[in-house]
């Protein structure tokens, strides 16, 4: 039987596992932070995603992402950044006590640090959200059960200069394909929530050394 990922036991276990990373990273400088929203949609445990507006400037427009953005000098820490950006993008207020902790950071092509913040936002009616249409085209969920099914998992191989460079996870057969760093963060989350059920064959890439 698949775990629901949102039980009191799951929360306690995840908070304990994330405590050290949270203490180490929450106040460390970072380029950006994103919220990884655990939620219940029609009673089903899920992760909440956004489709970035096609009107945005830059290479990430129209991509699937978690709510989040650049750290502001006035932000107290990366948790504050993630919660502020979620409110600005979705009109969703997430109390700080609903945050379970900080996940392992990921890095973009420019080696900028992006810190994922895991929180349980509870039961959610997507129709009640007020997305900022300048930043978000769509809000959708993918259930944990869907994400944990092997037929919905894959990998994308990237090449640079005609040579194999790196491989990242991809999650398929939902409203939109989840790939790139959003898929990496999804993989980190599934490894934490369901270690006995999600066992990827690919290690999450780390910041290149040197």
Swiss-Prot record:
Chain ranges of the Nudix hydrolase domain: 25-172
Annotated GO MF terms: coenzyme A diphosphatase activity; magnesium ion binding; manganese ion binding
Residues reported in the UniProt entry to bind Mg(2+): 85, 89
Keyword Transmembrane: no
Known catalytic reactions: an acyl-CoA + H2O = an acyl-4'-phosphopantetheine + adenosine 3',5'-bisphosphate + 2 H(+); CoA + H2O = (R)-4'-phosphopantetheine + adenosine 3',5'-bisphosphate + 2 H(+); acetyl-CoA + H2O = S-acetyl-4'-phosphopantetheine + adenosine 3',5'-bisphosphate + 2 H(+); butanoyl-CoA + H2O = S-butanoyl-4'-phosphopantetheine + adenosine 3',5'-bisphosphate + 2 H(+)
Enzyme Commission identifier(s): 3.6.1.-, 3.6.1.77
Entry-annotated residues carrying N6-succinyllysine: 70, 96
The gene coding this protein: Nudt8
Organism classification: Eukaryota, Metazoa, Chordata, Craniata, Vertebrata
Class in the EC hierarchy, top level: hydrolase
Oligomer and partners: Monomer.
PROSITE patterns for the chain: NUDIX (PS51462)
GO cellular-component term (any): mitochondrion
Cofactor: Mg(2+); Mn(2+)
Role of this protein: Acyl-CoA diphosphatase that mediates the hydrolysis of a wide range of CoA and CoA esters yielding 3',5'-ADP and the corresponding 4'-phosphopantetheine derivative as products. Hydrolyzes short- and medium-chain acyl-CoAs, exhibiting the highest activity toward free CoA, hexanoyl-CoA, and octanoyl-CoA and the lowest activity against acetyl-CoA. Exhibits decapping activity towards dpCoA-capped RNAs in vitro.
Keywords: Hydrolase, Magnesium, Manganese, Metal-binding, Mitochondrion
A biological process from GO: medium-chain fatty-acyl-CoA catabolic process
Pfam families: NUDIX (PF00293)
Annotated protein name in UniProt: Mitochondrial coenzyme A diphosphatase NUDT8
Nudix box (motif): residue ranges: 70-91
